[in-house]
Each structure stands twice: as structure tokens, then as C-alpha cells.
Amino acid sequence: LPREIFPLSTLGTSAVNSAIQLVILLGAIVVTGAIPSLAQLAYLPLALVVLVVYATLFALLLSALNVYMRDIQHLIEVITFLAFWASPIVYSYSYVQKALAVNYPVAHEIYLANPVTLAILGFQRSLWAAGIDQPYPVHLMIRLAVAALIGIVLIFGAHRVFARLEGNFAQEL
């Protein structure tokens, strides 16, 4: 049994939970009649790919590091907390755009370099009918594709780290 199955099993659990939530969301979309167009739905697969790719990347990398450095588990909590607040989950992207785009364009681009932010914006663009009139980053689809490609390349590096460290897992645990 490959050892990669252990960190990736957490992704499977999250996928099942997310699928249940997606079914509920789709039901709400149908009930409210706010059915997105095909152009909007085009963002959904790419947003999902970005989310899965980076979840896989961090699952492999951080699980391997956690075996050797137990405090990584606390760092994961901090990273999750920061990723939550650094993404337009509880606030609108329009606030960020107003605050950063004109006066601080470099900070705005750094904000948009966060793959979680791009995935959230992709989900909002595809499934949130009220979000149609909201501002979105220029070339969101291209940004999502680039983030996905970068993540796929980084997965190979994360797997290499995992493979290099897995030989001593039993000793360390």
C-alpha cells in the first residue's frame, strides 16, 4: 500500500463532504431559480481543479514534514486561518479591488496570486447568480488556468519531497 494514500485519504473525506454541500447548493439554486448560464458554469471545473491540485500539493508536503516536525500541525491551523481571511469568503472581492487595484496594484496582484482566492472567485463566478454584476479580476479564467498549471508542476516537487522523506517514517513515528 503506497504511503501517499494516507494524506490523500483526507482529500477523499473532504471531497465527500464538499459533494454533499454542492448537492444542497445546487438544490437551492434550482429552488430560487437563479440558474447560472453555461458561460458562468465554465469557471466551475477550473476552480475545482485549482482547489484539488493545491489541496493535494499541501497534503503531500505538509504530511511528510509533520512526521519530522510535529509543530507543523499548528502551522497548518495558522495557514488555514490566514487562507480563509486572505480570500473573499466572508467579504466581497469588490472591497479588495477598491482598496488595492488603483493605489496598490502590486499588492492587488499579490492578492490575486493566492490560488485559494482564485478558486473562491471561480466558484462565486460560476454558482452565485447575485455575483454576476460584481467585479471580478481581469482574465479570471486565464489566472485559474495558470494557477492550476503551476500547482500541477509543484505537485511533482511535493511528491518528490514526500518520497524522499517516507523512507524514515516508521522510525520517526
Residues covered by each model-derived region:
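Hydrophobic alpha-helical segments
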Residues: L82, I89, G122, S126-A130, ...
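Short hydrophobic, aromatic-rich alpha-helical segments embedded in or entering the lipid bilayer
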Residues: S87-M141
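Short cytosolic juxtamembrane segments of multi-pass membrane proteins
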Residues: D71, A163-L173
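Alpha-helical transmembrane segments and their short interhelical loops
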Residues: R3, L8-I79, A83, L140-R160
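Juxtamembrane helix-loop transition sites at the ends of transmembrane segments
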Residues: I35, S92-K98, N168, E172
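Short alpha-helical basic/polar micro-motif
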Residues: S63, T117, A163
